[in-house]
Amino acid sequence: MNFDMSKLMQQAQKMQEQMKKAQQERENMEVIGESGAGLVTVTMTGKYDVKSVSIDNSLMSEDKEILEDLIAAAVNSAVKKVEENSTASSNIYKMAKDAGIDLPSGINFPFK
């Protein structure tokens, strides 16, 4: 079996390009988290920046603590969606395979 260093470098470069693209896609994504059956919504970017918070007028007469809990739940919902939609970690095995690299399963990558 011959070891082709140039082929390995090409595969690694291709995988690096795919990882960069996946990271850019994550940074450009927007998700909406909600709570209280949609009465509170939070729009968040893939970089975890909150872009907007919307509170239904019907909640304005509610107790302050209830409103705070609903906002926190909506933010947590948005964070969870960003993590679920992250392509960088969820597709790393596919990217490696597409680049011609066969990764063993069970590798813990230092990113999400």
From Swiss-Prot:
Keywords assigned by UniProt, alphabetized: Cytoplasm, DNA-binding
Record region (Disordered): 1-27
Compartments it resides in: Cytoplasm, Nucleoid
Sequence ranges of Basic and acidic residues compositional bias: 17-27
Domain of life: Bacteria
A family per Pfam: YbaB_DNA_bd
InterPro entries xref list: YbaB-like_sf, YbaB/EbfC
Positions of transmembrane segments: none
Family: Belongs to the YbaB/EbfC family.
Subunit structure: Homodimer.
PANTHER family assigned to the protein according to its UniProt record, in alphabetical order: NUCLEOID-ASSOCIATED PROTEIN YBAB (PTHR33449:SF1)
Annotated protein name in UniProt: Nucleoid-associated protein FTL_1411
Organism, scientific name: Francisella tularensis subsp. holarctica (strain LVS)
